[in-house]
Structures are given as structure tokens and as C-alpha cells.
């Protein structure tokens, strides 16, 4: 036997073909959501309140401080929130202190700051009763970036950009004349020396002393016509505020507020970290030749002589001294923005590498490693980044790759929420300041100052309408899981589809182990929406980290010590692949080891390896890791396979795959669809609706019983996508369970494993051409045995509102409706649970008052005697739409009188749930896990299907031509291995990139006693004759996708027309017609079918009068009259006339043809006939 047995959960054993032992457990797969939100509640909120606090009025007399905050218990539970259509949230209360400095009076108060949406345990939010997910956003990290560019003459220049988290951008660039310019906040460019002068380095000599002598600097100084700090400040002010009278003081305060004010300019933690890393000397001196002797400032010890080349070893020696003040200079600018605040720079002189004689000396200036708490940019940062730019012109330093994951970071839920909350708070701050100055200072309370509306509004806006707050994809557990792990480059502050180029979308070497190279949508979003890799984590700065095993440099031993590294850190090391063979004691077995280093694949000796991959599946995402034999599939098809698994409809009887990857258990457990034990214990009672577990704990070696845990199961609930969400227990009373064990399966789960489809017997063969173009031929057995039957639940609601003419009424008493239509309604006029309904049946009877007419005396008398009955009402009942037939599952009634919260103007709301059992049909779409999708073209009786020598008919026939050109050979291996496993009565696991090899598959086939070529002789079910050739028959895992023919089938009789063109609308949702387009018209022209063509262009479309007459003629059995003028022709003429052209319609003998306008005599009756005939669907509500 090849492979070894592995246990997945309590109930499932699989034979695994994995050769690499797992050194690291998979992390919790939705940690990216939950951890980020926890950070927000713990620290994010606190940060926000400390940022904004204290708020003082314009005189500085009143001071408002935020001291502490707390979240209370949520008003409704998660289930109640869904049922009542409200947000699952908890009230946020903030302790506020108001201090009046004049009187010394202190007032403390707890202020309610609105309801704060809470995250559920499974990483989602419930907003207005619907489950939503906040998708993490991939953005450029705030930092300073350098890039090289070629101008139109082919000359190499450079550009630099300082990108903050919020605030003004600072850009540097060179031009053809070798002058260095700066742009402040996207304005026109000015010579960079103007900015240096404005900082307080007023004279040319000061600037040269600061940056070192350099021809680029000399060119720039020549171009710069401001000689002093004052002139420079005024020049900058005129650029930023054109048209305002410039003064030096205004210019100073403008620059200070633009760059050095923490409220207006924010680099965030990550920006300061990246900035210090880029501008720090230790990274910039590597490989450079010193032009001065380095001496320790404290001891006077010589650290490195002039002329020394700083390699890794020399650099490591002087590194501690660099931190301690080696090369520090104190810059004391005069008169500029930074006046009176001396700042430290760190400068070391090196010999320029682009000067062969070694004459030119460069200053390398660092920003003095500014403290992490300084979130705004400082003069030292500006000088160091300008210096880096000048160094780049002399080949010292590196340009940045913006698509490298070291330069892109994630904004997860917590940070997105924090940014939104900050906007709300800053709006509130403005209101507080205004109120402080208006209201009586002695009578003011904190409660009266604070207006929480802007805070609540900004949160509502974010959860309700942000691009990153999405309606959760709940088709199946895998779709839920993937949605929570999605990374989007779109959204506010990100890219747009149109602007994003090829480079941003492409796979980058730094994605390895961080972002999946396979799972991304097809279409305009390709590469902009990605999925987190299976082992990846996000660090405090928002960079994605991948885990690696450390290799001991002394002994060459691959240790079990796991380190998470960002893409930047990984660039410094040589990393070996996870599948490199190791000896028993953990050394590399081969002389040469395959490794990666900065995107290059190298073969190096074991002593040079620093780290090793943790697992072969760390490259791919959770969905991609569910594809067996992924290594044998073409990447384009694997992409489709990963995406289509998310569209699998939960089946009535799910069945976990015979050929799995071992990822099914983890995905199902972490998705949030299963019920997982929170504490160890013993199961006391199990019913379909709840599981009771008595907690047990170990005290001094003896077992002690504790509390009773209640786990409620969801039964037949509608998911966001209308599929059935149902949980069923998989444990029995008396079982001992551990913490983290699965207690109940969710939808698309089988014994704790993900089960998206069914294992069916598949043959690769053609059959009378019915599987042309990827079509699928299926046996009727799959219909009869409900193999691919799914349950769908649709929700319909009807509201009774107050109208101008009186309230609507939900009632059984509906005008012009027979008793037959009311037989399933109860006395309230609402359908009973369990009733079978068809299209057009009444679900909720409702009448709306019509316009009131003046009553005659007789009518008034009748009215007085019989009461309300004579009132004019019309029928606005809720009816079953087309294709919505099924069985009533549940009815919920909400009534304002019973204290239910309803939206304004609504008195009563009824929700009806209809459940459908959909069997598989011709026209339904199915797929395997390898991107092999197709539509069912024919369902054959079981007896007509080809059968195997033992008489078993096959279930599905696929076209063999679908395999070679698409290069997804994984399906063929799955087919053979599945057949062998089925014969052996086992389930197997073949993990991605470490699964069954070809020889393992053959060995298993042999073990199962199958034929050597794994093919089978098949017999034609119709004639009993054997087919000429042997056929590949096996077991494949096939899923039914959410594209079902019942949702797409549509036919129109008479329906709505567009208002202007009077042509039928399009699409199923509008009950529209089929478009007879340009090409179809050509076809009729080619056949000379003149009359058919004419009626398609006129009476079947937009000849308003003609279509009414045609209808009457058909009803009366007369011949259809001649067609008239299409409405669109009239529209065209009116448009030309509107342009001032005189357009007339002439007959063949040059007589002007009168076009009848809408108000002509024969139209009114036509229109009224039209209303009766054409628009039964459009009522007077509009």
C-alpha cells in the first residue's frame, strides 16, 4: 500500500499520499478579520480618542477631554437582528471631562456615542439584517519611493515621491538640463533648492555645505532665482495659494500646517517605519567606499579607515556606533520654517562609484532615525530624501518596485473602520468648537456640546455603501471563507479598474506564500482582487508575512523554529523549497539545493541556505488548495476550478470527495458554517435543533463537571444567495468532545468535511454528438435518486403603508378575485404554511384605496347602511412571480401595534418564505474541480447509458476532446485514482504539490485489481454491443453550479414598453422581450422574408397603434392589418427637428405624409385599448 492513513476530525480517515511532514498547523483561516477587529476595539478606538483629545475652544478656556470608553451588551442577539432587519451592534459610551479654566470647574459625564456594529464570531457584520463582510484593501504603503524613468531622448532620469497616509505629497524629479525640481502637493514644479531655503538654509553656501558639492546641485542653484529664505517662502506661497497676497509669516504657517502639523499630515506607524528603513544609513552604506576615517565620538577609537569598502562584515562592526551617534551633525537652520528647532542629521562621506578617479565625494545623509512616535514628516526627512535623490544620480542607492509586497500593505477591517471613525470624530470636533463659542460657558455640559450625528452617519455610510463593505457570498462554506480572505486593490484610496495597468495585476515574485497566484476573478478585475495564501499572516504594520523554517548557519540543520517574514525581509535571504529532501536528522540530502533569492531560482550548496519553506501549499489560497492534482493542471484552468468551487450549490445529500486534498476539513471548520465546540466536555443531549454539552475540566487529576453549554442549530434558513442553510449534528449523546471539534455539519458538509458536490461514475466518450462543445450527458438515475437535488429558499415581502387616500389593508376580502384563489389564505389574508403555490397565486391579500369620487345620495345611503364595503379599493396583493412556485416554508408578520420597529409609513409587514426543491435539469451548469465546466445537454434513461462489464451503467459522459487542448490533466488522474479508491472502499488525500505521483496512482490501480491501462470495455445500452475501443471510466467529483436554468428561462407574452422608444424592455427582471438585432435583420433580408421583417420592426416592436390593432384582429379572428410608422422613426424625426432641421416624410409621388401626433383623434381610444391590453402588469402605483 502506498501512502499512510490520516485522521480528519472524529469521523473521517483518508489515505494520504503526502511525503512532506507538516511542521506547522494551518492558522485560523479567518484570523485576518477577527484579529483586526479585536485590535480596533482594544487599541484602535483608544488611539482615535487620544488623537482628537483634548478639544479646546478658540480662547483656550474650555477644554473637553475623552477619558475612557466602554461597549455595553448588544440590544438584540445575532438571530434576532437578522429577523428584525436591524444592525447587530452594541452601544458605545464614552467618559468625557469638561474643564473650565477660568472657574476651575470640572464636569464629568458618560456620553452615548451611538451603536457600534459588532463582528460575529465568524468574521461578519450584520447590517440591517443582512450579513456583510468588510474586504481587506491592498494599498501603497506610506513611505518615500524612488523610480527611474527615461525621457523622450532616451536620457535616464529619476523621480521620487513622499507618500503620506494623509496629507500633501512631495515629489522630486530631474529634467533634461539636469536640474532637480520639487512639486508640493501636485502643483507646478519649483527648483528643489527653493524648498531647502524655505527650511532655513538661505544661502547657496549653506546648501552646498549641507548636501556636498555636486553639478546637479550647481545647475539647480543657477536656475533658482530666490536668494534668501524670505524670497523662497514667498515663492512657495505663491505656488500653493495663487492670487493671495503673500507674506513671510503666512508662508511659514502654511508650510508648517502642510507638513509639520500632526493633524494635517500623517505618515502612520507604518510610514515612519518605512521612512526610517529607507533613509537609515545602515542600508545605504552597504558596498560603498569610505572617503573619511570613521572615529567613535566617545572613545576616539578608529572604526574604519578612509578607502575601506563596507561589506556586510565591516558594516555589522560599525552598526552599533551608527545607532549611538556616529556621524551626527546638528543642523541649525535660520529664519526658515524649521527655525529655532535644531534637528539631528547623520552624515558619512563616501567616494562616488560613477567617478573612476575617486575624486568625487558624496555625502550620505540619514534622517537620524527619528522616533517612532513622530507621525508627521520632519525637516530631517525632507533633507535625507533629497540627499538620497542626489545620491541616486551618482548610482548610490536603489529604486523601488511599487508592485513589491514590501511596498504594498493591507488595510484590514480594524484600520478601515478607524479611518471612517476618524472622519466622523473630526466632523464632531468642528461642531463641539462651534458650540463652545456660542453657548453660555457656565451652563455648558459635555452632553450638550457633543453631537454624535456625524459619527453615526460616517459609520452608517461605511457599512452601508462603501465599496469594501460587501454582501457576503454565502453560496457555500468555501465561498464564505474565501470572501473573508479576499484582498482588493480597488476601493477608496486604491486603484480603479480603468487606471490599473498590466504590472499591478501581474503575479510578482514577492507574492510567494503571501497571495495566491491562481485565485483571482476572470474579467476586468483580474489581478486586482486576490486571495490570501493559506499560511499567510498580517503583521502590525499591515504587511503580509509568510512562515519559513530557519536553517542553522553553523550546522546546516533545518530546525523546527518558524519565523514569519515580510517580503522585504525575505529579500535578504536564500530560501529553499519545501519539497527538498531531508535526511533523518534534518540536513539537506542533496549536494545542490533548489532555492529562491529575489525572484531568481538558484541551485546552491546547503551551507548557503538561510531558510526553508514550511509546506508546499503555502503558495496557494484555501480554495486552490482544495483542487487535487493541481500540479498537473494548466494555471488558467486551475483559476476557473478555484473560482467555480465557490459557486457550488449545497446539495440535498452532500458527499465528501473520494479524492480530496486534506484541506476540506480545515476549510469547513474555519468557514463559520459548522458548529465547533468551545470547551471540552460530554454530550448530554442531541436534537435536530440544539446540542447540550456539559463542560468538564481536570482538577488535580480528577474530572470535574462544569456549566452546560447550549449550541443552537440553524434549520432551513435562507442564505444571502437564496440557497438553503441547514445544520445537522454529527455527534451522539454520551460522546466526549474536545475544544475545537466539529459538532454539527453546515450546508455542503459531510462528517465535518467540505462536500460541494458528489462522486459520480464518469466515462470520457462521445455519444451521438450530444456532448459536443463541453456539453454533458447524464443518466436519469441522478435525477431519480436526488443526487444533484438542491433546496432553494426565496423571500417575498409585502408592506401595508399609509397612502394619501388612507392606509392600505392586508385582508382576505379582495375585489374581483374568486374563492378558488383564496382557498389557501387564512382569515387575515396571509397564505398558510405548507401550502403549495404556483406562479400568480396570491401570497398576501392587500388592497389600496383608490381616488375618492363624489358620492351620489343613493351611494351615500348605501355607504351608511353597509359601512366600508362601498369604498373604492384596488387589488395590490403580493403574488408568486414567474418561476417562483414551491411550498410555503414560513410566514413572519411584523406589526407596528405589537411594538415591532418598522420603517416610517409602514403599518404592517409580512414576509413569506417559499422553498423549492430543484432537481437537476437539461441546461444546468456543472463542473469538476479542474475548470472543466459544461452544460447538461441530455438526460438519458438509465437503460440507454453505456454500461460496464458488470452491468453498472455510467452516470455521466464527458467529451474527451475537452482535455488535450485545455491541459487540465488533473481530471484524468483524479478519475483513475477515484475509481481505484472506490473499489478499495477508501477515501484518499492528495495535497497540492505533494500528492500522489503517477506511480502512486498506478500502484493504487493495481491494488484495486483494475486493468493495467485503467480503461474499461463499455457496452452500448441501446443495442448491448460493445464499443469499438476501451474507454476511460472512473469516479470524478462533480459539482452543480449556481447557474441554474430555472433562474434563466424566460418567455414574454405582452409586457412593459420603454417610455420614449416604445420598444419592449429587455431582460428577465423587466419581463422583457428578445432583441432581434442587426445581424438577425440581415438574415431575414438575405432570405427575402419581407413581411416577417416588417412585422418584427413594427407591430411586434414599436408601432403603437399597429400593435393594438393587431391584437384586436387576432382576438376577433380577422387578418392582421397593415403596419404603421414605428415610434422610433418618429423619435428620430423629432430629434432632427430639435436640431433645427426641417424633416418631412414624403410619399412616392412627392406628397407630404402627415405623421399623426400623440394627441390626434384616433389615438386616445388606441391608448385606452393599449392600457387594457398591453400593461396588465403595470398598475396605478406609479
Curated annotation (Swiss-Prot):
Checking Pfam families in the record gives: RNA_pol_Rpb2_1, RNA_pol_Rpb2_2, RNA_pol_Rpb2_3, RNA_pol_Rpb2_45, RNA_pol_Rpb2_6, RNA_pol_Rpb2_7
**GO BP: any one term:** DNA-templated transcription
Where along the chain is composition biased (Acidic residues)?
Answer: 1150-1162
Cross-referenced InterPro entries: DNA-dir_RNA_pol_bsu_ext_1_sf (IPR042107), DNA-dir_RNA_pol_bsu_external_1 (IPR019462), DNA-dir_RNA_pol_su2 (IPR015712), DNA-dir_RNAP_su2_dom (IPR007120), DNA-dir_RNAP_su2_hyb_sf (IPR037033), RNA_pol_bsu_bac (IPR010243), RNA_pol_bsu_CS (IPR007121), RNA_pol_bsu_protrusion (IPR007644)
Locate the region Disordered. Answer: 1150-1182
Q: Does the keyword Nucleotide-binding apply?
A: no
State the CDD domains in the record.
RNA_pol_B_RPB2
Keyword list, A-Z: DNA-directed RNA polymerase, Nucleotidyltransferase, Transcription, Transferase
Q: Where is the composition biased (Low complexity)?
A: 1171-1182
Reactions this protein catalyses: RNA(n) + a ribonucleoside 5'-triphosphate = RNA(n+1) + diphosphate
PROSITE patterns, sorted: RNA_POL_BETA
Molecular function terms from GO: DNA binding; DNA-directed RNA polymerase activity; ribonucleoside binding
Class of enzymatic activity (EC top level): transferase
> So what EC number does this one have?
2.7.7.6
Q: Any idea what job this protein has?
A: DNA-dependent RNA polymerase catalyzes the transcription of DNA into RNA using the four ribonucleoside triphosphates as substrates.
Family as reported in the entry's similarity comment: Belongs to the RNA polymerase beta chain family.
Instruction: Describe the subunit structure.
Output: The RNAP catalytic core consists of 2 alpha, 1 beta, 1 beta' and 1 omega subunit. When a sigma factor is associated with the core the holoenzyme is formed, which can initiate transcription.
Record-linked PANTHER family: DNA-DIRECTED RNA POLYMERASE I SUBUNIT 2
The name this protein goes by in its record: DNA-directed RNA polymerase subunit beta
Q: Which organism is it from?
A: Exiguobacterium sp. (strain ATCC BAA-1283 / AT1b)
> What is this organism's lineage?
Bacteria, Bacillati, Bacillota, Bacilli, Bacillales
